[in-house]
Amino acid sequence: MTINIKTDSPIITTGSQLDAITTETVKQSGEIKKTEDTRHEAQAIKSSEASLSRSQVPELIKPSQGINVALLSKSQGDLNGTLSILLLLLELARKAREMGLQQRDIENKATITAQKEQVAEMVSGAKLMIAMAVVSGIMAATSTVASAFSIAKEVKIVKQEQILNSNIAGREQLIDTKMQQMSNIGDKAVSREDIGRIWKPEQVADQNKLALLDKEFRMTDSKANAFNAATQPLGQMANSAIQVHQGYSQAEVKEKEVNASIAANEKQKAEEAMNYNDNFMKDVLRLIEQYVSSHTHAMKAAFGVV
């Protein structure tokens, strides 16, 4: 028996071939059925998992009343007003910080100026000490020079006196020798005055010179003492004036030191105020962030947004 099966191209089959084709078709249909069953099972598992996950997510409670636009607008206005106040506080804190920076710069300059003035006064005091030493040296040198001149003059006078005394003593010795000779020869009628009458003019002249030299010596010594007595008070007055000025300079140094300490304290206060303003700005920013975050969560909860 022959069966003709039409496909895309005409094929002539026998009975055995037909049985083989039928068996193959049955196998393929069984496999297709198994595949469809597996797909249905997978879809069922996915749907069960999806339903299980939906059952685990908590459902939000639906609002019992509708959205009030007026309240929403009012809430927005309150939020804007609060944020405006907080931003104003932030701006004030920023301005205060800028003022603190300026004040710190001013106090830094004041501290530096006070320290420079203090150093200048110390230098002035050192110069005064040098001036005092110079004045003392000048007065000492002047006294030394004056004393040297006086001593030189007195030495010269002393030498002249020694020469005159030696001359006078020599003449007296000659008179004594002459008297001894006259006594030896037995001539006692000649007196000492008669013998000394020969050298009397020289003796009188030398004695007068001695008196003048002695007077000159005393005058030189008096002048030296007077000069020393005059220069010592002048030196003391100069030193006293320098010491007074030095005392004023030391007082100025102390005053500048106090000003420097005050400026340093003011600088520390300015830095503390700046730290306070920085912390205040951080607190305001954190408050703004917390307020906006809380308002956002409240709005999400009001609209049922997860």
From Swiss-Prot:
GO terms for cellular component: extracellular region; host cell membrane; membrane. The chain crosses the membrane at residues 128-152. Keywords: Coiled coil, Host membrane, Membrane, Plasmid, Secreted, Transmembrane, Transmembrane helix, Virulence. It is found in: Secreted; Host membrane. Disulfide bonds: none annotated. Residues 29-57 are annotated as: Disordered. Residues 31-44, 253-273 form a coiled coil. InterPro entries: YopD-like. Residues 45-56 have a biased composition (Polar residues). It is a single-pass membrane protein. Disruption phenotype: The yopBD mutant can secrete YopH at the same level as the wild-type strain in vivo but is unable to translocate YopH into the cytosol of HeLa cells. Much less YopE and, to some extent YopH, are detected in cytosolic fractions of HeLa cell monolayers infected with null mutant. A mutant lacking the transmembrane region forms smaller pores with delayed kinetics. Its main location: secreted. Residues 30-43 have a biased composition (Basic and acidic residues). The keyword Transmembrane applies. The first five codons form a minimal N-terminal secretion signal. The N-terminal region may also incorporate mechanisms of yopD/sctB translation control. An intact putative N-terminal coiled-coil might be critical for full virulence of Y.pseudotuberculosis. The central region (amino acids 150-227) plays a specific role in facilitating translocation of Yop proteins inside host cells that is genetically separable from its role in forming pores on host cell membranes. Component of the type III secretion system (T3SS), also called injectisome, which is used to inject bacterial effector proteins into eukaryotic host cells. YopB/SctE and YopD/SctB are inserted into the host membrane where they form a pore and allow the translocation of effector proteins into the cytosol of target cells. Essential for YopE, YopH and YopM translocation. The core secretion machinery of the T3SS is composed of approximately 20 different proteins, including cytoplasmic components, a base, an export apparatus and a needle. This subunit is involved in the formation of a pore, called the translocon, in host membrane. Interacts with YopB/SctE. Together with YopB/SctE, forms a multimeric integral membrane complex. The C-terminal region interacts with LcrH. Belongs to the SctB/YopD family. This is Type 3 secretion system translocon protein SctB. The gene is sctB.
